[in-house]
């Protein structure tokens, strides 16, 4: 069991194939999914992430497949030397350095953000029952943000923009769904992947698809608990928030285009 340039290339290639299949499937479905299909997509996407997270050759299980196009030249390049280090070692060290710098930047941003929200007084607390335990999650209203989200590793906070009471009820339904399913930890897993493979655009595509699939899964689960009228209201509120967010971004882009 070891990590080599061939095992890393193998992990990337197998992940590309699986991601290609997922991309075609998602494109053909046009977001018309059943809950079973969404769960299967989540499993396949996590499987892709795990393969990238553990790019190892397992003795007795891994088998070499002969590829005569590009791969031999790439292997020869990786074995080449720069002084006493191989090209692979140099690239590996650069990758580690990049990961370290990104980790420092993200950690500082996260710490400063958590410090900021801890200074905000919660507008209320919501009680959530999970695994026979009841937890109080503080709800914070922040006027400067455009979207709702849940944040925090040890202690979670639900952050919401300045919205009316009716919209807030729908938003809390949505965010509590993410909390119960531990979606935040799954997203953290893919953030770690992006940290390790910052040079590989594949992981950003995987993260994007995975985030969208989680949103679809969450909406399907929430809607299963609502009446038909409540479902329509739920979708209308979320669409309204998405439209408002898109319009604000478009306005910002228009302003920047006029300035520059």
Q: Where are each of the predicted segments found?
A:
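Membrane-embedded and juxtamembrane structural elements of multi-pass membrane proteins
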Residues: 2-64, 68, 81-260
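Short membrane-interface loop/juxtamembrane segments of multi-pass integral membrane proteins
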Residues: 71-80
């Amino acid at each position: 069991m070891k990590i080599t340039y061939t095992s890393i290339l193998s992990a990337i290639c197998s992940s590309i194939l699986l991601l290609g299949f997922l991309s075609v499937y998602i494109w053909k479905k046009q977001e018309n999914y059943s809950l079973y299909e969404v769960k299967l997509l989540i499993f396949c996407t996590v499987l892709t992430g795990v393969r990238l997270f553990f790019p190892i050759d397992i003795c007795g299980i891994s088998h070499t497949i002969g590829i005569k196009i590009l791969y031999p030249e790439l292997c020869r390049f990786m074995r080449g030397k720069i002084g006493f280090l191989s090209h692979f070692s140099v690239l590996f060290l650069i990758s580690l350095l990049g990961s370290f710098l990104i980790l420092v930047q993200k950690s500082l941003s996260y710490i400063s953000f958590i410090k900021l929200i801890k200074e905000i007084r919660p507008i209320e607390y919501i009680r959530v029952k999970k695994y026979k335990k009841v937890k109080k999650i503080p709800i914070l209203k922040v006027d400067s943000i455009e979207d709702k989200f849940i944040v925090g590793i040890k202690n979670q906070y639900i952050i919401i923009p300045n919205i009316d009471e009716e919209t807030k009820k729908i938003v809390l339904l949505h965010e509590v769904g993410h909390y119960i399913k531990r979606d935040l930890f799954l997203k953290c897993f893919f953030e770690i992947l992006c940290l390790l493979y910052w040079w590989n655009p594949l992981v950003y595509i995987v993260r994007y698809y995975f985030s969208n699939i989680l949103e679809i899964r969450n909406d399907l689960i929430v809607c299963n608990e609502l009446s038909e009228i409540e479902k329509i209201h739920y979708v209308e509120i979320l669409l309204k928030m998405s439209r408002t967010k898109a319009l604000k971004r478009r306005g910002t882009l228009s302003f920047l285009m006029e300035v520059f």
